[in-house]
Amino acid sequence: MADGRFDPAKDAANRAKHNLPLVFGDRIFEDDNHLIIPSIREIDGEERFKVVGIVGEKLFTGVFVWRGELPRFISVRRSNKGEEQAYHAAG
């Protein structure tokens, strides 16, 4: 993605660790019932968020910061148990 919405090095690391490109995070937002929650970890003074949503019948989580009106993804992966519980509790 040439629009600067993610760091190419972080994209490569995410692909190696989670087998997902960071751009996959956009698909999580396509879930009409996606959940956005503040991330517990605050790094470098940035307010981070998690988006949790279903893609292809599986639950995924993207960690991101807002850049204007667009998310800049830091990590994209399958959701953990706590994120699954939060998603289903909100629904």
PLM-predicted stretches and their roles:
Residues M1-G91:
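Ribonuclease/tRNase effector modules and their secretory precursors
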